């Protein structure tokens, strides 16, 4: 399997997974034009679309792509049914695409019906997890989002996290505002800054490394707990997550 990314809008990535024959699955096509261009250039043969949630920048290109490739199966949670999904999927479902098995996990938080798709090592997590951060809580609760992130955190170390947005630099700046002396975060900041100066993408990322720099995956970390305790004593990791998310919302 080969992983490809297509830039879209200002900071979106549309992921395309292809096999050796050129058959492919397209993840969260927010717009059709760049996808159609890439398909023509690479002579890909689209078989399916994966949708993680209903937001327009993830589903806006579905109907046009179906006009060009009506044979495609469009998988998505119930909230995407009116966005072009032809096969509804949910927590615990498994589907076989390109000869590979993908497992679905419900990840409410960013939206209530959000899901991610996992076929080792590939994780297509939509707007649940970003490198150095996580999605805003437009519909769900902090508790829901925390539990969703813990599902990701329980995956194998070598999981390849395919986030949907290039938010890494801003997220790491936030992390440094909380833990300015953290060696892992500082090293990652230098690396990410250099990549972005060159206009190179910072994704995908490996989960083992992400655990070191993403505060939202480090709510049990003693340094972070000590920093939060300077402002308020929070005993539960979910409460510490909510504190972090609130700080990020106003950063």
UniProtKB/Swiss-Prot annotation:
Cite the cofactor comment. Answer: Binds 2 Zn(2+) ions per subunit.
Query: Would you say which domain of life the source belongs to?
Result: Bacteria
Q: Which reaction does it catalyse?
A: an S-(2-hydroxyacyl)glutathione + H2O = a 2-hydroxy carboxylate + glutathione + H(+)
Describe which pathway this protein belongs to, using the record's wording.
Secondary metabolite metabolism; methylglyoxal degradation; (R)-lactate from methylglyoxal: step 2/2
Q: Does the keyword Hydrolase apply?
A: yes
For biological process, the GO terms are: methylglyoxal catabolic process to D-lactate via S-lactoyl-glutathione
PANTHER family in the record, alphabetically? HYDROXYACYLGLUTATHIONE HYDROLASE (PTHR43705), HYDROXYACYLGLUTATHIONE HYDROLASE GLOB (PTHR43705:SF1)
Q: What is this protein called?
A: Hydroxyacylglutathione hydrolase
Q: Which organism is it from?
A: Salmonella paratyphi C (strain RKS4594)
């Amino acid at each position: 399997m080969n992983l490809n990314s297509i830039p879209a809008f200002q900071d979106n990535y549309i992921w395309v997974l292809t096999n050796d024959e050129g058959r492919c699955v397209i993840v969260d096509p927010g717009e059709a034009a760049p996808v159609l261009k890439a398909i023509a250039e690479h002579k890909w043969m689209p078989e399916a679309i994966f949708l993680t949630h209903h937001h327009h920048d993830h589903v806006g290109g579905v109907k046009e792509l179906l006009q060009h490739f009506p044979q495609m199966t469009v998988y998505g949670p119930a909230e995407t049914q009116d966005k072009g999904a032809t096969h509804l999927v949910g927590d615990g479902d498994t589907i076989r695409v390109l000869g590979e098995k993908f497992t679905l996990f419900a990840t409410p938080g960013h939206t209530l019906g959000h899901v991610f798709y996992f076929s080792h090592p590939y994780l297509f997590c939509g707007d649940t997890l970003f490198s150095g951060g996580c999605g805003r809580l437009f519909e769900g609760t902090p508790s829901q989002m925390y539990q969703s992130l813990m599902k990701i955190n329980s995956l194998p170390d070598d999981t390849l996290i395919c986030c949907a947005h290039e938010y890494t630099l801003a997220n790491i700046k936030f992390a440094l505002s909380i833990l300015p002396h953290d060696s892992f975060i500082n090293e990652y900041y230098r690396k990410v800054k250099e990549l972005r100066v060159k206009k190179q993408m910072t994704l995908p990322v490996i989960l083992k490394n992400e655990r070191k720099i993403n505060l939202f995956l480090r709510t049990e970390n003693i340094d972070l707990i000590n920093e939060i305790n300077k402002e308020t004593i929070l005993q539960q990791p979910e409460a510490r997550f909510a504190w972090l998310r609130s700080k990020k919302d106003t950063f």
